[in-house]
Amino acid sequence: MTRIVGHTRAILTIGDKMKIGYACTLALQDDTKMRSCIAKNASELRLIELIDHNLTALSNILTYNHQQGIKMFRISSDIIPFGSSPINSVDWQTLFQSAFTFLQEQIKRYDMRVSMHPGQYTIINSPNPEVVQRAIVDLQYHCALLDLLCEDATHKMVLHVGGVYGDKQEAMKRFMAEYRELDETIKRRLIIENDDRYYTLEDVLWIAEKIQIPVVFDNLHHKLNPSLTNLNEKQCLALVKQTWKSVDGRMKMHYSEQDPLKRAGAHASSIE
């Protein structure tokens, strides 16, 4: 039996028939492990070797998921090492075109829905323009990768709103202003998530109404950073569903449970 690990959270679509998936990696499956390197070892040859390995690993993951009836999967941002950094000057989109074509065919054939989640430093509401510019470059990388793998806009990039910087309302306004300036190819894939510290479900729903962006509901984040306390989770999901249009596909949610032995927000290794 293969144990699924990653961010130890389930990724769900809600509808007449629920689909379930997971984030990033498999345990006990050596041919699915991603590889990377440190910056000083990131020669062009080494990066090409790593990208080739990682794309093969992704193909193996997709095959495994299909065999297990798993229809959703979050792809690791590290699949292209230093993908949004000038350290990586490899023209990987062209060099690996045939591999991406094969992966796209797999995703279509398996009826798989994939996603990505740019990291904690991808912050478009920062008051620092350099931070915002780096975030935009990172979003461009994630979007380019998804565009090579998936044609339609149902395959999403999940983003947190970002920091508060001493004035939450102004930070929310900056997020909306920066979002409006993003390229349409990025906006068609972006969805925002309630986080466990700063931005509640109520906050992201307010933003979603203003800029017409889908919301993904994270149940554990909602428990740690609650809002709309007069509503149960089913009622919260009904509000979230209203942010999704047909072009976005079926509504998604993130489901995980607290590890009782670790800090608040640490995911349990399984879901009951």
Indicate where each model-derived feature is located.
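Alpha/beta catalytic barrel-like cores
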Residues: 14-113, 120-136, 140-151, 156, ...
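Domain-core and long-helix interface of multi-subunit machines
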Residues: 169, 192-198
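A general structural motif
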Residues: 170-175, 236
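Glycine-rich phosphate-binding "P-loop"
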Residues: 156-171
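Short acidic, Gly/Ser-rich segments with clustered Asp/Glu that frequently serve as metal-coordination loops
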Residues: 199, 222-224
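Fold-independent oxyanion-binding glycine-rich loops
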Residues: 25, 162, 195
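Short, positively charged low-complexity motifs
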Residues: 1-12
